[in-house]
Amino acid sequence: MIKLRLKRFGKKREASYRIVAINNLARRDGRPLEELGFYNPRTDEVRLDVPGIVKRLQQGAQPTDTVRRILVKANVFEQVSATAAS
């Protein structure tokens, strides 16, 4: 199963995260199938590849709870349902 989850990078105590599509059995920082965005919790900065995320969600990828919250804030699920309806 493919998951959309956070991959940690950055210095100690200054973590940032990449939002990646990855096999659910892979390690947290393992090689992703695709990098779909960036999240910095210290500054609340978020950059998303929305078309790529929509494509992965339509293929059946499951977001983790944290990634789901980020996507809800960015209204990505509305775009998924709009794409599915048309």
Swiss-Prot record:
Q: Would the keyword Transit peptide turn up in this protein's UniProt record?
A: no
Gene Ontology terms: biological process: translation
Name a Pfam family for this protein.
Answer: Ribosomal_S16
SUPFAM superfamilies (UniProt xref): Ribosomal protein S16
User: Record's superkingdom?
Assistant: Bacteria
Keyword terms of this UniProt record: Ribonucleoprotein, Ribosomal protein
Q: Does the keyword Transmembrane apply?
A: no
NCBIfam families (alphabetical): S16
What protein name is recorded for this chain? Small ribosomal subunit protein bS16
